[in-house]
Swiss-Prot record:
This is GTPase Der. GTP 2 binds at residues 213-220, 260-264, 325-328. It comes from the Bacteria. PANTHER family: GTPASE DER. Keywords: GTP-binding, Nucleotide-binding, Repeat, Ribosome biogenesis. HAMAP family: GTPase_Der (MF_00195). The lineage of its organism: Bacteria, Pseudomonadati, Pseudomonadota, Gammaproteobacteria, Enterobacterales. GO terms for biological process: ribosome biogenesis. Residues 381-465 form the KH-like domain.
C-alpha cells in the first residue's frame, strides 16, 4: 500500500513550501477538501520512482492550549493517518517553546518521526541545528525546501521501510560472470521476457473496483445494492490498517473485488447515518483499484471537491466510470440541466461512460458492469508494435506534424510502453517540440483507432538521438599505421 507522509510544525517553518516542491514532482496537488478540516491539504508525490501520499497540516501555535486544540483538530488526525511524520523546525529561528511542545506530543505517538531543520541555506547548518538535538527526536535532517537541497535524501531515508529491499548480488568468479552474461543474452534472444509479458492474462485476474465520492452521495447504498443483487457476499477481508474493506464477489462468472471506503460491512447492518469519509482511505483505494466508480449526487451537482477527486483518479491513471446517483424523482427539466452541467464540467473526460442510476431503488445499477468490463479490457489490452506504428503513420498521413524551427517533425515508429493505463511511446526527430494541440490530436487518433473507452491513454515522446553524438573519432591501430605512412609519403613528395 502506498505510504502516507504528514508534515507538522509551527507556522512559517516551510511545510507548504516542502509540500509544493514534492507534489510538483508529479504535478498532482489534490488541493483542499472543503468540509473536512480547513487547513489540511492532500497530495500525491513521487521521488526517484517511489510514490507516496503527503499531507500538509496547518501550523500549530506556541501556547500549550493552542497545541492541544489544533493538534486534536487537524494535526493529530493527520499524524494518526500517516505512516511517517516529518516534524519541521526553522533553523534560522532556532529552538522555540512551541517546537518543544510539539515534540512532547510526537514522542507520545508510536509513529516513525523525522526531525527536519528547514531554511539551512546560507547559514552554517551544523551550528544551526545543534540546539534541536535536545528535543530527543534523534538525528536532525537539514534541508532547504525552497531550493530543494536535502529533500530527496530526506524522503529516501524516510521511505526505507516501505521500499522492497533487493537481495545482494552473489559474488561471482570471472568465469561465472562471463557465463551469466552470455546466458542473459541468450534469454533475450529467445524472447523470454516477451513470453512472460504475454503470459499475463487479465481475464483471469479479479477486477478491483473502488467506489469513491463525497459524503452522502450514496456510496454505501450503491455498495450494498451491488452486493444485495448478487447475493454473493462471502466474507469481509481487511484490506489496510485504515479499514478499507475488500469484498470479493462474483457476477456472470466473472470475479470482482469491491474496495469499500464507505464503512459498509455486511448486508443487514446498513444504517442511514452519515457515511464516514476519509481522504486517505479514498486515495489509497484509488491507487489499488483497476476501475474507479466516481459517484456524484445529481441533486447537488458537481463540486470542486468532485473535480479534485477526479484529478487524482486521472493522475493515478486509473480507469473511470462516472455514476450520477439519485436520478429518480428529478423532473425532465432538472435532468436536462444536470446533463448540460456534466457536458460543461466533465468535457475533459469524454472517454468515460456516464451512468444515471438510483442506488436506492436499483435502477441502472446492473448496467454499470458492462462499462466496468469495457474500461478494464481497454486498460489491459495488449497491442503490437506493428499495429501502433501503423496507426501512427495513418495519423501522420491524415494530418502532417507542424514545422519546428524550419524543419518538419518526423515520427518514426511507436510501441507500447505500459498498460493500465495504456502508454504509447513514439520515437522520432524533434518530437518533444510538438505543440500540445498535435499531441492531443495523436492521443485522440490512437483512442479512436484502438476503440479505447473508460481509461486515460498516455503518449510519451522520445527523441531519435544521434548515436555518434559526443563521440570522438578514434582510429584503430591499423588506421594509425596507414595515417603515419601517408604523412611520411606526403613529406617526401614536398
Amino acid at each position: 500500500m502506498i505510504p502516507v507522509v504528514a508534515l507538522v510544525g509551527r507556522p512559517n517553518v516551510g511545510k507548504s513550501t516542502l509540500f509544493n516542491r514534492l507534489t510538483r514532482t508529479r504535478d498532482a496537488l489534490v488541493a483542499d477538501f472543503p468540509g473536512l478540516t480547513r487547513d489540511r491539504k492532500y497530495g500525491r508525490a513521487e521521488v526517484n520512482g517511489h510514490e507516496f501520499i503527503i499531507i500538509d497540516t496547518g501550523g500549530i501555535d506556541g501556547t500549550e492550549n493552542g497545541v492541544e486544540t489544533h493538534m486534536a483538530e487537524q494535526s493529530l488526525m493527520a499524524i494518526e493517518e500517516a505512516d511517517i511524520v516529518l516534524f519541521l523546525v526553522d533553523a534560522r529561528d532556532g529552538l522555540l517553546p512551541a517546537d518543544e511542545a510539539i515534540a512532547r506530543h510526537l514522542r507520545s505517538r508510536d509513529k516513525a518521526t523525522f526531525l527536519v531543520a528547514n531554511k539551512t541555506d546560507g547559514i552554517d547548518a551544523e551550528v544551526a541545528v545543534g540546539d534541536f538535538y535536545s528535543l530527543g527526536m534523534g538525528e536532525v535532517h537539514p534541508i532547504a525546501a525552497s531550493h530543494g537541497r536535502g529533500v530527496t535524501q530526506l524522503i529516501e531515508d524516510a521511505l526505507v521501510p516501505f521500499i522492497p529491499q533487493e537481495a545482494p548480488a552473489p559474488v561471482l568468479s570471472e568465469e561465472e560472470e562471463n557465463a551469466a552474461y552470455w546466458a542473459e543474452l541468450e534469454a533475450e534472444a529467445d524472447g523470454e521476457a516477451q513470453e512472460e509479458e504475454e503470459a499475463f492474462d487479465p481475464i483471469n485476474q479479479p477486477i478491483k473496483i473502488a467506489i469513491v465520492g463525497r459524503p452522502n452521495v450514496g456510496k454505501s447504498t450503491l455498495t450494498n445494492r451491488i452486493l444485495g443483487e448478487d447475493r454473493v457476499v462471502v466474507y469481509d477481508m481487511p484490506g489496510t490498517t485504515r479499514d478499507s474493506i475488500y469484498i470479493p464477489m462474483e457476477r456472470d462468472e466473472r470475479e470482482y473485488v469491491l474496495i469499500d471506503t464507505a464503512g459498509v460491512r455486511k448486508r443487514g447492518k446498513v444504517t442511514d447515518t452519515v457515511e464516514k469519509f476519509s481522504v486517505i482511505k479514498t486515495l489509497q483505494a484509488i491507487e489499488d483499484a483497476n476501475v474507479v466508480l466516481l459517484v456524484i449526487d445529481a441533486r447537488q451537482g458537481i463540486s470542486d471537491q468532485d473535480l479534485s477527486l477526479l484529478g487524482f483518479i486521472l493522475n493515478s491513471g486509473r480507469s473511470l466510470v462516472v455514476v450520477v446517483n439519485k436520478w429518480d424523482g428529478l423532473s425532465l427539466e432538472v435532468k436536462e440541466q444536470v446533463k448540460d452541467m456534466l457536458d460543461l464540467r466533465l468535457g475533459f473526460v469524454d472517454f468515460a461512460r456516464i451512468h444515471f442510476i438510483s442506488a436506492l431503488h436499483g435502477s441502472g445499477v446492473g448496467n454499470l458492469f458492462e462499462s466496468i468490463q469495457e474500461a478494464y479490457e481497454s486498460a489491459t489490452r495488449r497491442v503490437s508494435t506493428a499495429m501502433l506504428t501503423r496507426i501512427m503513420t495513418m495519423a501522420q498521413d491524415d494530418h502532417q506534424p507542424p514545422m519546428v524551427r524550419g524543419r518538419r517533425v518526423k515520427l518514426k515508429y511507436a510501441h507500447a510502453g505500459g498498460y493500465n493505463p495504456p502508454i504509447v511511446v513514439i520515437h522520432g526527430n524533434q518530437v518533444k517540440d510538438l505543440p500540445d494541440s498535435y499531441k492531443r490530436y495523436l492521443m485522440n487518433y490512437f483512442r479512436r483507432s484502438l476503440n479505447v473507452m473508460g481509461t486515460p491513454i498516455r503518449i510519451q515522446f522520445k527523441e531519435g538521438d544521434n548515436p555518434f553524438a559526443n563521440k570522438r573519432n578514434t582510429l584503430t591501430p591499423n588506421q594509425m599505421r596507414k595515417r603515419k605512412r601517408l604523412l611520411s609519403h606526403l613529406k617526401k613528395t614536398k
